[in-house]
Amino acid sequence: MATKKKKSLVPSFPPEPRPNPNLFVCTPMYGGMATGYYVQSLIQLPSTLQAHGCNMGYSAMFNESLIQRGRNALVHTFLPKKEFTHLMFIDADIKFNAADLVKMIQADKDIIAGIYPKKEINWGGVKAAVDRGEPVEDWKKRTGSLVINLKDYANTVTVPVDQPVEVNCAGTGFMLIKRETFEKMEPFVRKYKNDVGFIDGGIGAEEIIEYFACDIEPGTERLLSEDYYFCWRAREAGLKVWAAPWASLGHFGTYLFEGGLLPAP
């Protein structure tokens, strides 16, 4: 005779739906100055996010010459604002497409960054394009040296452009970070007492978590910039860093134009 299965007295509930992502955009803005390309891109962002059910907050850090301290202060501002699920660093010299950022949110990664060129011209890349006989209109694409350290792509820069790619390090100039990422990283980083003017204009004595710093990487003995340091600490915490190859970014900078008449052969 089959035994009747006892009914569980513990009520079951459907899983709670995940809240819509809400973005807190942070910009270190030395001198309080931003490029027109950044401003033009930023203006398009709120409406694009709202069309996808996302709200947006914003904070900028003026006149902080020490970039790692500026980024730490911006994270310190973000953390108590529990309504925001993601912090998005966008530097004031970056040109971006808001739709690319939406796709970065949808990728659902702990850390994902856009790939942008350094403020230098990769003349070697241009020469290689000329030697290969590439069309003149494509030479511009070869001028950039990218702010990225690829993982498992040591001998190639060919990656799938429509999906996230795992990297060792990426620049923080266009980086999306989940709130949970900071919580997971906290045991792996230090804290310090703030002794400078804070974002609201006051002098705060708050204890600030040092997610960003410059340090020497064990093993390689490389001096890490604040963004590569952040990625290193994230990997120590068991997290992965991803790049968004689909993000089309510009990095605005000044350039000294030089030239003159050449002597006759």
Regions found by a protein language model. Give the residues of each.
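Short beta-strand-to-loop acidic/aromatic patch adjacent to the donor-nucleotide binding site
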Residues: 83-95
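N-proximal low-complexity "stem/linker" segments adjacent to membrane-targeting elements
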Residues: 1-65, 69
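Anion (oxyanion) recognition and catalysis
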Residues: 50, 105, 235
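Conserved catalytic core of nucleotide-sugar-dependent glycosyltransferases
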Residues: 75, 97-214
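Residue-level detector of anion-binding/catalytic polar loops
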Residues: 55, 93, 110, 240-242, ...
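C-terminal catalytic/acceptor-binding lobe
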Residues: 2-24, 187-265
